[in-house]
Swiss-Prot record:
Record family assignment: Belongs to the IIV-6 170L family.
Source taxon at top rank: Viruses
UniProt organism field: Invertebrate iridescent virus 3 (IIV-3)
Name of the protein in question: Uncharacterized protein 97L
């Protein structure tokens, strides 16, 4: 079995393939239920109305951006200061939930992060450390993202959006069943596509 990982705070994606078939395709938000003002402002009004109903607030079916901001401001003033989220701990907790898969894998692919993205780079180091501590006899590969499309025989793709579209289409063509359903319903398909394509490209080496 082989697993691949694409580091992200809100989109920590990973996949596992066994005997030619994907048995795990996941995308996890390491922040969990933590919601920022920007997150809420991007949320559809219908979802915000439901959220306000659950909070026993009178939304009257109408909601405006200022209402969202006032809710957040009121909550911030009335609640104690929140403890900062330790992303390293959240990463380890996520990995622990899927240990039944990791124990069966013999190879782990961790997508190489750009030096300019210090948060992602730090998390990738945490992930590699976790894998090497728990599975010292297994292969942990720091895998270059540039290998994916080239190894999979993609045509020249000059821009990043072009490469994202191609990998999404490629992943959709090989996933099946509930994993395809999950992929199609995911708003960030490119992250899931990355981990699927990483495995496919690595196995063509």
């Amino acid at each position: 079995m082989i697993a691949s990982f694409d580091i992200g705070i809100k989109n920590f994606a990973f996949a596992v393939k066994r005997d030619g078939e994907f048995v795990l395709v996941e995308n996890v938000n390491l922040l969990g239920d933590f919601v920022t003002k920007n997150d809420l402002n991007k949320t559809p009004k219908s979802a915000l109305v439901e959220m306000m109903d659950r909070l026993n607030l009178d939304s009257k079916g109408q909601i405006k951006k200022t209402m969202v901001e006032s809710i957040l401001t009121a909550q911030k003033k009335s609640s104690p200061k929140q403890r900062a989220i330790d992303l390293g701990v959240k990463l380890f907790e996520t990995m622990d939930r899927y240990r039944s898969f990791w124990t069966e894998c013999d190879t782990f692919l961790v997508e190489r992060q750009m030096v300019s993205n210090m948060q992602a780079l730090k998390l990738s180091h945490y992930l590699e450390a976790y894998l090497k501590i728990h599975y010292p006899d297994k292969s942990v590969v720091n895998y270059s993202a540039s290998n994916k499309t080239r190894k999979l025989g993609a045509p020249p793709l000059p821009t990043k959006p072009d490469r994202k579209r191609w990998t999404v289409e490629y992943a959709a063509s090989i996933l099946t069943g509930r994993h395809l359903d999950k992929f199609q319903s995911c708003p960030k398909k490119d992250d899931l596509a990355d981990v699927v394509c990483m495995i496919e490209a690595y196995q063509k080496m």
